[in-house]
Curated annotation (Swiss-Prot):
Catalytic activity: GTP + H2O = GDP + phosphate + H(+)
Lipidation (S-farnesyl cysteine): C185
Binding site for GTP: 10-18, 29-35, 59-60, 116-119
Record-given protein name: GTPase KRas
Organism in which the protein naturally occurs: Oryzias latipes
Pfam families per record: Ras
Description of activity control: Alternates between an inactive form bound to GDP and an active form bound to GTP. Activated by a guanine nucleotide-exchange factor (GEF) and inactivated by a GTPase-activating protein (GAP).
UniProt keywords, alphabetically: Cell membrane, Cytoplasm, GTP-binding, Hydrolase, Lipoprotein, Membrane, Methylation, Nucleotide-binding, Prenylation
């Protein structure tokens, strides 16, 4: 069974834990209890493949930012979460993305942009803004509500699909490099 290491990042209070718990336990946690770091595992079937999701729910609070490098090193894919009613959390996405790319030492890291709390009427981040940002990053965008469960499975499953695509691409690039290295050279 394939295991996928997913990391949920974003500012404090955007609903990272609520999204994760909704996926794992099928219920909504409405009280806010800042996370330091929690790990969850769930077996699911995505596109006919049984897989194990190893999900790391991270601290959004700035005082825990030193821990970020460590979990970013081990993660294969990242859900970058902001709240649609919190413009600052949307602006913070740039910072998280840059940190992930720096730690992974790669421009090409599987990510999904997630706009959470779409059940709330007090939107300050327009859907088009988020779609444009995701497009500029070359990553998918999904709106979710941990409360109503809208888009929750889709967000995590899309990230798994992004990781699969990335692994396939890396595998093909590896094969191309091997083919190139088999060329013969004759010295006279």
């Amino acid at each position: 069974m394939t295991e996928y290491k997913l990391v949920v990042v974003g500012a404090g209070g955007v609903g990272k834990s609520a999204l994760t718990i909704q996926l794992i336990q099928n219920h909504f946690v409405d009280e806010y209890d800042p996370t330091i770091e929690d790990s969850y595992r769930k077996q699911v079937v995505i596109d006919g493949e049984t897989c194990l999701l190893d999900i790391l729910d991270t601290a959004g609070q700035e005082e825990y930012s030193a821990m970020r490098d460590q979990y970013m090193r081990t993660g294969e894919g990242f859900l970058c979460v902001f709240a649609i009613n919190n413009t600052k959390s949307f602006e913070d996405i740039h910072h998280y993305r840059e940190q992930i790319k720096r730690v992974k030492d790669s421009e090409d890291v599987p990510m999904v942009l997630v706009g959470n709390k779409c059940d709330l009427p007090t939107r300050t981040v327009d859907t088009k803004q988020a779609q444009d940002l995701a497009r500029s990053f070359g990553i998918p965008f999904i709106e979710t509500s941990a409360k109503t469960r809208q888009g929750v499975d889709d967000a995590f499953y899309t990230l798994v699909r992004e990781i699969r695509k990335h692994k396939e691409k890396m595998s093909k690039e590896g094969k191309k490099k091997k083919k190139k290295s088999k060329t013969k050279c004759i010295l006279m």
